């Protein structure tokens, strides 16, 4: 899907992106989160020039999850110019998610 990159901060990565960033807040133990993997791969394939997808493990980055008030998994947050503009909790089918995101890009 995407390559892992190191950033000094999450905010730096968001503000440095020239396209909107869809952040997938997940946990390895979360079954619905695992269901999102192929869905996000399809989204990435169809919207790769218009969107960047980043996965954040809420177990490793609990402070980020808390900062963005993540209380359910999976939660997708769309950021534009470093600011959260849309939030989706739970699993959506790829076509539904793509249609929803296209209306926001």
PLM feature spans:
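Cofactor-binding loops of NAD(P)H-dependent oxidoreductases
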Residues: 56
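Proteins that catalyze or organize thiol-disulfide redox chemistry
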Residues: 1-22, 27-50, 59-63, 67, ...
